[in-house]
């Protein structure tokens, strides 16, 4: 039997099996674990009472997190004219139109979010095979296809959680970083959960927010009391 590493021993000592934590307790445990060699994110998984096989129960959205994510986000914008200027003023890292499409086709993908003005979708649509598999394809459902490109840039830069329910009915999102205090994580989690509740499909029956799990990149998943964060 392989020996446990120091980190694995620390995790085993810190985590109580089958315990349901308050959000503050979960953050305290994850922040107390031995640090990894990189800045770990704090991630949330929310099990929803939906059937993703049904098109009207696919929950998808974007939530602007009041305490941010702690990450530097590089944003590319497809726009021209006044919208392009507004995007630049809002802090976009790359702004272009046909030239930006050519750059992407040439392999330049040094950004985390792609935003497009509606009239740019005729150009962006041709990039689906490149942007789609990387989760970068602009979509109006998450606010990345919009005439207000400046507002979208500001939201992306300030820190957003983007999510889409997976085949198991779970959404996953980064909610901060290891080292964030519990108050900041609570702000972010409550905002995300409130948005998820607004997105509840009309055809979803029974319990909607079924389970919440908080984890760090290299750490364990801790079950959080749904009633502790849900309205």
Curated annotation (Swiss-Prot):
This protein's GO CC annotations: cytosolic large ribosomal subunit
RNA-binding listed as a keyword: yes
Gene3D superfamilies: 3.30.190.20, 3.40.50.790
UniProt KW rRNA-binding keyword: yes
Any one Gene Ontology molecular-function term assigned to this protein's record: rRNA binding
Disulfide bonds: none
HAMAP family for this protein: Ribosomal_uL1_B
Record-stated family: Belongs to the universal ribosomal protein uL1 family.
Function: Binds directly to 23S rRNA. The L1 stalk is quite mobile in the ribosome, and is involved in E site tRNA release.
Subunit-structure text: Part of the 50S ribosomal subunit.
PANTHER family in the record: 54S RIBOSOMAL PROTEIN L1, MITOCHONDRIAL, LARGE RIBOSOMAL SUBUNIT PROTEIN UL1M
Protein name stated in the entry: Large ribosomal subunit protein uL1
Lineage: Bacteria, Pseudomonadati, Pseudomonadota, Gammaproteobacteria, Moraxellales
Gene transcribed to yield this protein: rplA
């Amino acid at each position: 039997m392989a020996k446990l590493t120091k980190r694995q021993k620390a995790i085993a000592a810190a985590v109580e099996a089958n315990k349901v934590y308050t959000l503050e307790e979960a953050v305290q445990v994850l922040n107390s674990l031995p640090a990894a060699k990189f800045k770990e994110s704090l991630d949330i998984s929310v099990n929803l009472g939906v059937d993703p096989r049904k098109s009207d129960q696919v929950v998808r959205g974007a939530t602007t997190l009041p305490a941010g994510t702690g990450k530097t986000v590089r944003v590319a914008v497809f726009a021209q004219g006044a919208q392009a200027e507004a995007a630049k003023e809002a802090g976009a890292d790359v702004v272009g139109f046909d030239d930006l499409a050519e750059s992407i086709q040439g392999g330049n993908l040094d950004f985390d979010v792609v935003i497009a003005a509606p009239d740019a979708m005729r150009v962006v649509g041709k990039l689906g095979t490149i942007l789609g598999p990387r989760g970068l394809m602009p979509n109006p459902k998450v606010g990345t296809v919009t005439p207000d490109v400046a507002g979208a840039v500001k939201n992306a830069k300030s820190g957003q959680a983007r999510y889409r329910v997976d085949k198991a009915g779970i959404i996953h999102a980064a909610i901060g970083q290891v080292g964030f205090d519990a108050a900041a994580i609570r702000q972010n989690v409550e905002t995300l959960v409130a948005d998820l509740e607004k997105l509840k499909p009309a055809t979803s029956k029974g319990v909607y927010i079924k389970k919440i799990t908080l984890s760090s990149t290299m750490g364990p998943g801790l079950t959080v009391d749904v009633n502790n964060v849900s309205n």
